[in-house]
């Protein structure tokens, strides 16, 4: 709980972080479908005998190539099956945390029997949409998630509607924290980070503990593309310098290796994504350790990173053609710059350079290769900080970067929200043709 004596804006900042920074086991798009299946199974009379599911094109894109934790299998069908047979309907993004070996075996058997289908919802105007319908004979239950990975909007069974979400806001009801955040500025966020009582933000240290454990697991070298472990090995061979820059990349990418490779450890997510959480957290942790920062300084740097990442990503569609590891790394750049320098000018220059560097990176679906994009984004973030410390940055005379960092962010988000929609459709078409 936060201190009710804090000013209302600061309370909304803290609520925004608490809503957007949560533990998640497994890539959040397949997990969203697993949650829909788990909730549907909880409403079903009798055991699940068959699963049908429908998802948006973007969710299909992010579910085709990613490993579901504990199963050794990729894709949405195993996520839907395991959610239905072994999911915890009350666990949100950790829906599969209690899945047993028997549940995994049963889910694989259901798949092998041809009792699980996942299709693209047509037509579909939602970017993030998942619907699971589970059957027992003629009895059924159906759950629909829209807009957010855990945002259940409709529950229905063969007996009738159980729940439906009304989107209207009651008179006098407070605006959501994200709505409030959308009207703030980076300067206001920095003021909060500098002045908020440590006790009110101490909770954010848990995000570092969770993702550091994931990073350590990734360094074992058995997950995903094992980028972190490989780069660490090259340091030992003398092919890569063992310094702060390489440590940032190694420890950050290792966490993503484990995450995308199916390790049964949760990641602390940001904006509904484990990789965004990893990218916002791990570079800041590594730099904090390098400078011997105490818990309070680490917490403040993490809050700046998380809030900056959320603030930027909130101006984007929840899923898009833009790789959001890049925007999360902009948050990390802010957090690292604050640790080293603390000045708003340094932070804004670092973010502007990031926008001038990695803004064109596409999202071609969740997979092991996400760790490559995470490593690139983390490296670019530290490079941008180093430039800013030397009073150097991509300027408003170049590309989409403006003279004001807020306008630079708006330009990037406009590009991703509008012009990159055709890019997204082309990516999905290419991936669908590969799957046929």
Curated annotation (Swiss-Prot):
InterPro entries: Ser_deHydtase-like_asu, UPF0597. Belongs to the UPF0597 family. This is UPF0597 protein YhaM. Coiled coil: none annotated. Pfam families: SDH_alpha. One of its GO terms (molecular function) is L-cysteine desulfhydrase activity. Transmembrane segments: none annotated. GO terms for biological process: L-cysteine catabolic process to pyruvate.
């Amino acid at each position: 709980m936060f201190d009710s004596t804090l000013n209302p804006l600061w309370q909304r900042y803290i609520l925004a972080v608490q809503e957007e920074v949560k533990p998640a086991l497994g890539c959040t798009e397949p997990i969203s479908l697993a949650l829909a299946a788990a909730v549907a199974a909880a409403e079903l009379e009798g055991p699940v005998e068959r699963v049908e599911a429908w998802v948006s094109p973007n969710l299909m894109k992010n579910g085709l190539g990613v490993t579901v934790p504990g199963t050794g299998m990729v894709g949405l069908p195993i996520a839907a099956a395991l959610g239905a047979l072994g999911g915890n309907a009350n666990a949100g993004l950790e829906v599969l945390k209690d899945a047993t070996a028997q549940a995994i075996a049963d889910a694989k058997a259901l798949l092998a029997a041809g009792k699980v289908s996942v299709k693209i919802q047509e037509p579909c105007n939602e970017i993030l949409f998942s619907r699971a319908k589970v059957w027992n004979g003629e009895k059924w239950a159906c759950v629909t998630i829209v807009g957010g990975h855990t945002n259940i909007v409709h529950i229905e069974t063969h007996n009738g509607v159980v729940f439906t979400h009304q989107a209207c806001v009651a008179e006098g009801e407070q605006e959501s924290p994200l709505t409030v955040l959308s009207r703030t500025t980076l300067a206001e966020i920095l003021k909060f980070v500098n002045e908020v009582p440590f006790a009110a933000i101490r909770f954010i240290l848990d995000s570092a503990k969770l993702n550091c454990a994931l990073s350590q697991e990734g360094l074992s070298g058995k997950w995903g593309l094992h980028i972190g472990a490989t780069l660490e090995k090259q340091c030992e061979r003398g092919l890569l310098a063992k310094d702060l820059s390489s440590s940032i990349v190694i420890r950050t990418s290792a966490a993503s290796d484990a995450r995308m490779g199916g390790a049964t450890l949760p990641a602390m997510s940001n904006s509904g994504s484990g990789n965004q959480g990893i990218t916002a957290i791990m570079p800041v942790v590594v730099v904090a350790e390098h400078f011997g920062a105490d818990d309070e300084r680490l917490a403040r740097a993490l809050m700046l990173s998380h809030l900056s990442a959320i603030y930027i990503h909130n101006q984007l569609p929840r899923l898009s053609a833009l790789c959001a590891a890049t925007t999360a790394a902009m948050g990390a750049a802010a957090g690292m710059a604050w640790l080293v320098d603390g000045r708003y000018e340094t932070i804004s220059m670092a973010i502007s350079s990031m926008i001038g560097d990695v803004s064109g990176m596409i999202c071609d679906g969740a997979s092991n290769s996400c760790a490559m994009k995470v490593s690139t984004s983390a490296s670019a973030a530290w490079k941008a900080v180093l430039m800013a410390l030397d009073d150097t940055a991509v300027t408003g005379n170049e590309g989409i970067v403006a003279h004001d960092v807020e306008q630079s962010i708006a330009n990037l988000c406009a590009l991703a929200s509008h012009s990159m929609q055709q890019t997204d459709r082309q990516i999905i078409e290419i991936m669908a043709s590969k799957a046929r």
